[in-house]
Amino acid sequence: MFKLKSRRSNLLKFHRPKLQLNEAPIPVLKLESKQCIQNLLNYQPPKIRLQIPRSRCAAVLVALFVGRTGDLYVLLSRRASTLRTYAGDTSLPGGKWDAQDHSIEWTARREAFEEIGLPMDRQKVPLLCVVEPFLAGNQLVVIPVVVLILDNTLRPILNAPEVASLFSHPLISLLHSEPPFSTEPEMLEMKYHTYVDIAAHEGHVRMHRFLTGREAGGTKPIFGLTASILIRVAAIGYGREPDFEVFAPDQPSWEERLAHVLRHHLVFREAAQQEGIDPDKTAGSKTDDAHPGARRGRVRSKL
């Protein structure tokens, strides 16, 4: 669990799920999908003792739902072309923590409500789990919040200045290098899954890209942070690693990356100091999994 220096309730407290599978009105559900949901419900992220400044925290909502044939899909949005940053990108609903947010789950739900009109009702959209943090461009710490949409009658209400369109993608396809959809002749030379390794401190970070099958209509592939988050959620849910290499050979662990930005990046140092956190002290902290064998022995603890 994160330790944030404040007398207020812990912003990043991991909430316990309220969903019981045998009570939920889920449509026809494949055994594989049911096991995925159960695995997500049971997931306990590694404990972290890094002190992270709240002003550099953000959350995204990984909203899953059951499709007509019993498979699990994730909701994705196409960002408006008029946005100043990441215009037109494929993304998950989410945004920065607000001072009025009493938890990181609340941040994710609030942003999803504002962007796509997804109700904040935990009965209709119960929590499955909260996943360990990711770094977004060395500027923000992003925490994925995974939920399950039980009410299939819900209709999106898009915030046009922020969201151009909404679509879904099969979750399990984030574990495969082959496409889940039929490929058009003109796209045969385009691989469904590709990656590029970006230089980072003491190594590289692998950035994945997946086609959505909607590129002809202007939708961009699932790329970078969004792809990494969905790979992680799919691996937790389906209980197996992808059929491709997730990490670069020299990729630092996610706790090493967090410690590095807390100590060396100005935006994090200034934010930490403003919130009464010693960035040098917190950057020297360790997670429960930060032993010498953690990087290779437990690859799921990495970004």
Residue ranges and their predicted role:
Residues 1-163, 172, 177-180, 184-303:
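N-terminal leader/linker segments that precede catalytic domains of diphosphate-processing enzymes
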Residues 169:
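Cofactor-binding loops of NAD(P)H-dependent oxidoreductases
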